[in-house]
Design a protein with these regions (language model features):
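Cleavable N-terminal export/targeting peptides
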Residues: 1-27, 170-173
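Gram-negative (and chloroplast) outer-membrane scaffold detector with strong preference
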Residues: 49-142
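Gram-negative outer-membrane beta-barrel domains
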Residues: 119-121, 127-173
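Short glycine/serine/threonine-biased micro-segments
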Residues: 31-33, 110, 127, 163
């Protein structure tokens, strides 16, 4: 009888550890990030992330980018030289394999592609980078992203920079 109770307790302990270990696997999040990119650019990204096994994830995103310049007439940045200099928008997908895991944080490569437009023609990008996530209460995550975009048919061949943002869980936990 004592051996049966020990086995039942062991089974309960193993089952509870399995439930805790997979608490954030297969979850979805909506994210918003903003960043500064070289040379004289800012971007904003709205994303939906689907997490798979072992913190790997697929991200579907919409991105907007603005590149500012000095106004040649007045010699400094104006509203027109900021907002109307060079703008792009794009939609894309990125695969994010987890490469580092710690307590309440993890890091992932970000590899993907996107398509979109500037104000005149079609533009495509190859996206690569590293994203580090910090897990807060209730599944909310803060992230820092080092990113590089290789443009196809765009004015900027390379865009590289840093973004920060937050992700909120959606659906049932």
């Amino acid at each position: 009888m004592n051996a049966i109770i020990k086995r039942m307790m062991l089974a309960i302990c193993l089952a509870s550890m399995t439930a805790v270990a997979s608490a954030q696997t297969y979850s979805n999040r909506i994210g918003l990030g903003v960043g500064a990119l070289y040379e004289r650019g800012f971007d904003a990204t709205l994303s939906v992330e689907h997490e798979t096994k072992n913190h790997n994830a697929w991200e579907y995103f919409i991105n907007g980018y603005v590149k500012y310049d000095k106004d040649e007439n007045v010699g400094h940045i104006t509203n027109d030289s900021f907002w109307k200099n060079y703008r792009t928008w794009g939609v894309g997908v990125a695969y994010k394999p987890c490469v580092f895991r710690g307590k309440n944080n993890y890091g992932a490569l970000r590899l993907g592609g996107s398509i979109g437009s500037d104000t005149h023609e079609f533009v495509g990008w190859v996206n690569a980078g590293y994203e580090h996530n910090f897990v807060l209460h209730h599944g909310i995550k803060l992230f820092v992203q080092a990113k590089t975009d290789l443009a196809i048919n765009g004015l900027d061949l390379f865009r590289t920079g840093v973004s920060i943002g937050v992700k909120f869980p959606v659906g049932k936990r």
